[in-house]
Amino acid sequence: MQRYFPLPAALLSLIFSTSPVQAANADTTWLASWTASPQAVWGSDFVLPANVPAVLRGHTVRQVARLSVGGPRVRIVLSHAYGKVPLRIGAATVALAANGSAIEAASLRTLTFAGQPAASMAPGAPLVSDPVDLAVPDLARLTVSVHLPQPSPTATFHWDGRETAWIAPHDRTRAARIDEAQTGVQTTTARLLLSAIEVEAAPGAQAVAILGDSITDGASASLGMDARWPDFLAERLAPQGVAVINAGISGARLLSDGMGENALARFERDVLAQPGVRTVVVLLGINDISWPGTAFAPREQRPTLAELKAGYAQLLAQARSRGVRVIGATVTPFEGALPGTPLSDYYQPEKELLRQQLNAWIRGSGQFDAVLDFDALARDPAHPLRLLPAYDSGDHLHPGDAGNRALAEGIDLPLLLNDQSPRPAYKAVLK
């Protein structure tokens, strides 16, 4: 028979007492303020070029990201999700961004990992930095620099970063700026390794995640201008202390892999596991409908409405098991999409019919906590199957900057809040 012995009172006191560190931690939490969903780097046989070197050899990668909300401390998350071998990080820094590749020198901080300035990333794993004392305001632009001292295959990236990144020889993590004209310096608009930036926040702080495709990822947004529709939404929610994270991937699909894993497979990693997410907006379906039969997926069959509904039902089930609200967004018009390209068959009347059926279900099913009718907001009243010309980037599929702003400004903000009072805006003073 198993016997149980009482513990001495002094030992009980040691076990259940709260240390000063624990007390401090109880007053704060970590909140996702910016994300870029990881993708596997594809080969040269894909329709679109990857636009990254196959191997980095002793290079520094410098990237800029705009936070949604700020805080007194930050930490950085790197991703090696699709790597097959360990990846060595030799040094890493974070700083407030200046112009281009330049940094605000007084803000430069060394990143450490378990107290060490270097680390090894396990295949398939993320790497989270130690917290850094760097007070950052809402909507701050941060520069993250990472040095890879050993030959490193580029297995994980985010293809459409909408920002210039610099790849420079040697350890340039503490450089005031990186000169693009210098021998060996390359640039790309993809993101390498960097997948999230978190800020220290008060308990109960919340984030809104956007799960989407190229319309969310900002395929036609102006480069370096933070002009994707989640960027404009972040500007509206920052004064209330609510973060916005972008889990869009250009070419993303709900049911099938494309230029990234299908949404059902990546939902946990890219949305539900992100700290502070209480609400997710889902804007997906156009690539499920339109990729099959094109150069993107020439041998695939288009899904049925029932299959799309079943996919959405799985997202809803995953989210609600975690207490996360789900906002459905209708799919925007796309008649005449991608003219003069190898994908001119992206739009077809039978695909349009399926889009209409999916939108009718999103609007009327009652399955979502709320609905954002982006179709009604973005369409041309004179030609409802097309984007309003003022919102059209020119490819008849993706909104331009004005269209992205209109989507963000057309949202009734209380729909996104999880019945909690948001905190005031964070205004940092650099020390």
Question: What is the predicted function of each stretch?
Answer:
Residues 264, 290, 332-431:
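Catalytic His-Asp segment of secreted/periplasmic serine-dependent ester chemistry enzymes
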Residues 8-17:
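Bacterial N-terminal signal peptides
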Residues 2, 10, 23-211, 221-223, ...:
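N-terminal secretory targeting modules
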Residues 202, 249, 376-379:
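Residues that form or immediately flank small-molecule/cofactor binding pockets and catalytic motifs
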Residues 34, 57-63, 78, 86, ...:
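Conserved SGNH/GDSL esterase-like catalytic core that processes O-acyl groups on lipids
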